[in-house]
């Protein structure tokens, strides 16, 4: 795990890590809440971070009021939250960097890029939005009653994390993952801190900043995820000059779940101009490690079938397909459907 350091932002200490030796500095701004040390204990997230570090020098931090950073002395405004990016860049010795923000982290990256264009090399958002709540002229946000329902769920089940299972259906039944997620939540924020963070997100409306973004921009969204409607990213791409929109497969809001390499490949290509040569990988096990259902799903995936098509063929839910594929990828040591198909013979899988 990389060393954790602190940067001073006014009266608040911001915890950050810098790792990787790629040619591009990349500030990774997480969504909602985070814990930069516990992140390395979850295999999917740790692999996501290592993959970023393979092509960039990554600056990863906990926003004020979450994780290892100081609690916010009061409800921080957008300007304060956004300026924490500048502070960690200074501390890490980065004069100019690409910005990568997940969910509300994307909003902070957009605000930073608009305020500090000279320090922003490029912008990547994933699963983000221009406004969190629905309005007459912005129909993709959450209705106020849905926010209230989510807050009630947080109050009832913060300690277990079950209130957020709908955001990441591929791991909803994965007991090991859910146990880590519950511990991650408890370490990253108290229930009242989590409620406060979601309340701040509900107030976000950065539509007025979008015309000020003048750097190369990549907007990524999983078309079928339910936590943040894809219409949000379509709006961002339509209102940021020259932005490229990439819609990817999957149902999870967290980018490190499901086919994370589809997202990572898009980011690497955007930032570096191409993909590094595939490195030789050793798989943990072969086809014999898969359950019968996993073998069925993998065979259909190798044949080119989509998750909805596999679900229909096997009379199961798309959520179940995504969950089985994620487990199969982990067992086989592959990270995408493309790699699965390419290495099927080596892994003892028939197409």
Region locations from a protein language model:
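Conserved HGGG/HGGXW glycine-rich cap/lid loop of the alpha/beta-hydrolase fold
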Residues: 6-70
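Short beta-strand/loop motif that positions the catalytic acidic residue
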Residues: 213, 219-221
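Catalytic active-site module of serine/aspartate enzymes centered on a nucleophile-bearing elbow/loop
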Residues: 243-283
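Helix-turn-helix DNA-binding segment
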Residues: 279-326, 330-332, 339-351
């Amino acid at each position: 795990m990389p060393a954790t350091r602190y940067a001073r932002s006014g009266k608040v200490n911001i915890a950050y890590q810098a790792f990787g030796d790629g040619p591009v500095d990349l500030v990774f701004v997480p969504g909602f809440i985070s814990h930069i040390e516990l992140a390395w204990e979850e295999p999917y997230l740790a692999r996501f971070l290592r993959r970023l570090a393979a092509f960039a020098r990554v600056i990863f931090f906990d926003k004020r009021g979450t994780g290892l950073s100081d609690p916010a002395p009061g409800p921080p405004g957008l300007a304060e939250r956004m300026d924490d990016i500048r502070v960690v860049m200074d501390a890490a010795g980065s004069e100019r960097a690409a910005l990568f923000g997940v969910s509300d982290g994307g909003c902070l990256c957009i605000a930073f890029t608009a305020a500090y264009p000279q320090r922003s090399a490029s912008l990547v958002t994933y699963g983000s939005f221009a406004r969190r709540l629905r309005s007459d002229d912005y129909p993709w946000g959450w209705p106020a009653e849905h926010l209230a329902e989510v807050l009630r769920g947080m109050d009832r089940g913060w300690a277990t994390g079950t209130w957020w299972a709908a955001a990441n259906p591929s791991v909803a039944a994965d007991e090991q993952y859910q146990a880590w997620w519950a511990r991650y939540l408890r370490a990253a924020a108290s229930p009242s801190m989590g409620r406060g963070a979601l309340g701040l997100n509900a107030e976000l409306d950065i539509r007025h900043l979008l015309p000020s973004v003048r750097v190369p921009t990549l907007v990524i969204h999983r078309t079928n995820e339910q936590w943040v409607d894809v219409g949000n990213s379509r709006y961002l791409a339509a209102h940021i000059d020259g932005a490229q929109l990439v819609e990817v497969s999957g149902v999870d809001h967290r980018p490190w779940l499901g086919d994370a390499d589809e997202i990572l490949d898009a980011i690497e290509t955007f930032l570096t101009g191409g993909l590094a040569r595939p490195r030789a990988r050793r798989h943990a096990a072969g086809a014999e490690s898969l359950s019968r259902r996993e073998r069925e799903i993998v065979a259909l995936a190798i044949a080119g079938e989509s998750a909805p098509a596999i679900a229909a063929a096997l009379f199961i839910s798309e959520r179940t397909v995504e969950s089985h594929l994620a487990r199969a990828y982990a067992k086989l040591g592959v990270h995408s459907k493309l790699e699965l198909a390419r290495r099927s013979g080596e892994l003892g899988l028939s197409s």
